[in-house]
Amino acid sequence: MTTAKSGTTIEIIGAVVDVEFPRHAVPKVYDALQVDENNLTLEVQQQLGDGVVRTIAMGSTEGLKRDIAVKNTEKPIEVPVGKETLGRIMNVLGEPIDELGPINSKEKLPIHRPAPSFIEQSGATELLETGIKVVDLLCPFAKGGKVGLFGGAGVGKTVNMMELIRNIAIEHSGYSVFAGVGERTREGNDFYHEMKESNVLDKVALVYGQMNEPPGNRLRVGLTGLTLAEAFRDEGRDVLLFIDNIFRYTLAGVEVSALLGRMPSAVGYQPTLAEEMGALQERITSTKKGSITSIQAVYVPADDLTDPSPATTFAHLDATVVLSRQIAERGIYPAIDPLDSTSRQLDPLIIGEEHYRVARGVQETLQRYEELKDIIAILGMDELSEDDKRAVRRARKIQRFLSQPFFVAEVFTGAPGKYVSLQDTIRGFKGIINGEYDELPEQAFYMVGSIEEAVEKAKSL
């Protein structure tokens, strides 16, 4: 039976479902449709004419058949927002999946909203201390900025992100929203228990659309998480939005794009790649009311940073943290590349003269070592001048001092985690490049927090 607001399914191809409505009651693009028989939500993507709309399913289409009644809700997908969402795990539709009962929030907001206008936005120059030495020194984060964690498979994107959430929740007691976009379910589960054990779960709202979910879920779960973060921001808070992984958001778009009948573009990506990325990224911004600081893990296919997906993401970021396989192979964790990682905040007017000089000094020393590596490989250390030998020794100490034991990795390493303040970080590296610790062995600098710990460790070596 078809009423004015209901239609029927006429074609189902994978995650894409075509629905026919009466000509005078065709749903708008992004309207949510409800299939009561399968308890499935569809989102309108295209109007094909003759009353037919093409939709993406926000769930599995198994068991769906033609001629089933579909109801138009006449509004986009809406999700619960506010403090009631903290400590809870939700799916793309804002439904709880942690078996702890319903989320009784006072307000629901649509996941499709316009980005704040130019007048509402505010610039960000205040620094956010993370307690991770290499980040605070060489690619400092701004409150209200966007940060990308770039890395191939298995170099530690998720572990770095978990450490950042833990440090910021405990040291800055801020609210965070975590959107798991197409990542491993095991990681999502580990993450939940990690937050629980660190007693920061009551400050984090979790939204998951994992690898095993249909592409519709993975395509929209980022927007669900973003909507939660926007609500906290509009209450006047400084909120953190973690997205793991932004590449899977692109990938879900690829999966759906062909089914929607679009021609693929470069490397088989969807032709609307830049527009889809922009729609998400432009909403992640700080307004005069509050700020959203976003940290996004970016998987780099085959370690190729020129691939269209990471390349499109680069354009939106204030800071890029590049994880390197070569550094991970040397056993230095976090495996952040100190010469490849960048930040717009690395400016003497923002971070101060001393911090800037130390950061540039560290990079100069490491760069000199990189240049000398070929000579060392062919002729050995003995052929270098005294100045170059000293630079190499200091660079090797700096490399090791950039490593640090993480709180979230205690279970793997057995070493207690360390949070290092920005002052301690600057002081330590300043001492190394000024030659104050030239007599200490390299090994003393490996996997310690502050410089005092390195001095203590040297005594026992």
Swiss-Prot record:
Main localization category: membrane
EC annotation from Swiss-Prot or TrEMBL: 7.1.2.2
GO cellular component: plasma membrane; proton-transporting ATP synthase complex
Top-level class of the enzyme under EC nomenclature: translocase
Bilayer topology: Peripheral membrane protein
ATP-binding found in the keyword field: yes
InterPro entries registered for this protein in UniProt: AAA+_ATPase (IPR003593), ATP-synt_VA_C (IPR055190), ATP_synth_F1_bsu (IPR005722), ATPase_a/bsu_AS (IPR020003), ATPase_alpha/beta_chains (IPR050053), ATPase_F1/V1/A1_a/bsu_N (IPR004100), ATPase_F1/V1/A1_a/bsu_N_sf (IPR036121), ATPase_F1/V1/A1_a/bsu_nucl-bd (IPR000194)
Catalytic activities: ATP + H2O + 4 H(+)(in) = ADP + phosphate + 5 H(+)(out)
PROSITE patterns: ATPASE_ALPHA_BETA
UniProt-annotated binding residues for ATP: G151, G152, A153, G154, V155, G156, K157, T158
GO MF terms, alphabetically ordered: ATP binding; ATP hydrolysis activity; proton-transporting ATP synthase activity, rotational mechanism
Subcellular localization(s) per the UniProt record: Cell inner membrane
Cross-referenced NCBIfam families: atpD
Entry similarity comment: Belongs to the ATPase alpha/beta chains family.
Subunit and partners: F-type ATPases have 2 components, CF(1) - the catalytic core - and CF(0) - the membrane proton channel. CF(1) has five subunits: alpha(3), beta(3), gamma(1), delta(1), epsilon(1). CF(0) has three main subunits: a(1), b(2) and c(9-12). The alpha and beta chains form an alternating ring which encloses part of the gamma chain. CF(1) is attached to CF(0) by a central stalk formed by the gamma and epsilon chains, while a peripheral stalk is formed by the delta and b chains.
PANTHER family in UniProt: ATP SYNTHASE, ATP SYNTHASE SUBUNIT BETA, MITOCHONDRIAL
Function: Produces ATP from ADP in the presence of a proton gradient across the membrane. The catalytic sites are hosted primarily by the beta subunits.
Protein name: ATP synthase subunit beta
Origin species: Coxiella burnetii (strain RSA 493 / Nine Mile phase I)
Lineage of the species this protein comes from: Bacteria, Pseudomonadati, Pseudomonadota, Gammaproteobacteria, Legionellales
